[in-house]
């Protein structure tokens, strides 16, 4: 996934969302969501823990389950005051994806028949996240850890120096 993000998706998102971390995406979380009789059949309105999200349809043997997308979470009007007419329904097509800002409110309408799988990639920018956490809307208090995290990074701080 890292080469896909670095070589291709970052180029696209850099053009689409330059002011929202699109060109500085440096980490990701990828997972598959499943909808069907033995799983969830819909998904309530929400926003993602990402600067940019890619949602790719992995099959086409289903009906219903459209993705609906609308206003930004950070818009001044409360999401609870939103009306259904403010949202746009997007059909899933095998192998096709939708790229949107993580803060864009969205959900999935009920699946009517079949089983649907989607690859979801949450892409994150430490440049953006180090200034403001997209989930709590506060400046993060970072602690350095090994490995990769959720798009945050902490720089080393000298706590003493020789004079």
Predicted regions and their residues:
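Fe(II)/2-oxoglutarate oxygenase catalytic core
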Residues: 1-94, 103-163
């Amino acid at each position: 996934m890292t080469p896909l993000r670095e070589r291709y998706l970052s180029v696209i998102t850099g053009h689409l969302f330059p002011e929202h971390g699109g060109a500085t995406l440096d980490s990701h979380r990828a997972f598959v969501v499943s909808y069907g009789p033995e799983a969830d059949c819909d998904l309530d309105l929400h926003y993602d823990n990402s600067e940019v999200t890619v949602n790719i349809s992995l099959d086409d043997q289903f009906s219903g389950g459209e993705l609906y997308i609308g206003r930004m979470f950070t818009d001044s009007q409360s999401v609870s005051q939103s009306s259904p007419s403010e949202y746009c329904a997007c059909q899933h097509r095998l192998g096709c994806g939708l790229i949107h800002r993580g803060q864009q409110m969205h959900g999935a309408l009920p699946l009517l028949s079949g089983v649907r799988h989607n690859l979801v990639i949450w892409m994150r920018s430490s440049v953006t996240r180090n200034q403001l956490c997209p989930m709590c809307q506060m400046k993060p208090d970072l602690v350095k850890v090994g490995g990769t995290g959720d798009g945050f990074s902490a720089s080393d701080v000298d706590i003493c120096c020789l004079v």
